[in-house]
Amino acid sequence: MKKIFQFIGLFVLICFSFFYTEKAITVLNEQDPIMVEIENKKDYYYLKPIDATIKYNTIIPGIRGKEVNINKTYDNMKKIGFFNEKNIIYDDIKPSISLCDNYDKYIIRGNSIKNGIALLFIIKEDKYLDNLIKIAKDKDITVNLFITTDYLNNNISKLYKFTNTEIYNFAREGIYQKDLIILGNNIINRNAKNRSSYCLTKEMFTDTLNICSKNKMHTIYPSKIINSNFYSNIKSDITKGDIILLELTNNMLEELNTIIDFIKKKGINIIGLNELLNE
């Protein structure tokens, strides 16, 4: 019995020793000039998150905020011996209203803070595809290809060659069913550089929204759908955050270089959906 009490006493002593040591280290850290400066400046580097905008059955993504991770930043700066803002380590702050929690809404545009737009194209055959990819590469932009599952299934070996693109599932020409979603997504996720995260609809079909939502995919309803007079339509009305679906035709390709140059001159980036819609 005596040995048991001795063991318990030793255990309590060790626990107290650890607690006291940790407390002492915490006090010393709090008095360190580096820690003091981090505490004093953390509010300056705080970035408030912006909530997604929901109106009826539509959504515009928000923007994540960030805050200084005090302990990780302190450990990082302690290695160099002084405060340096380049060594600050941040934690993301998810918006209270977030795209990630709302699969049952149509994404109608990106957040204008991103200073970008997305160009979308539907692909169901090879026609014009090589020319489109060449223009995207030459102009150093990213285009978003919504590809039918038939084309995906018959052209798997080509996908890795699609530079300057993001690839998404267009199922059976926009008709989404569970088996087509699984097939198309598996092909894309295994062979493309991006994950298959989005469905595309030209009209607000509840069936599309429901089945894509059940499969944890967001549904995009473009800000603009342009089938003719491509340059004129874009020139007359373009804003940051636009998601523009362009019909892939010979006339469109003839105007695409001019369209890209016009958008760039306005200081707007032409980017992938992943970047435009990521909070």
Regions found by a protein language model. Give the residues of each.
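Metal-dependent polysaccharide deacetylase catalytic core of the NodB/CE4 family, i.e.
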Residues: 117, 126-231, 240-243
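A generic local structural motif
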Residues: 105-106, 230-233
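Terminal accessory/targeting
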Residues: 1-119, 134-143, 239-279
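S-adenosylmethionine/decaboxylated-SAM
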Residues: 236
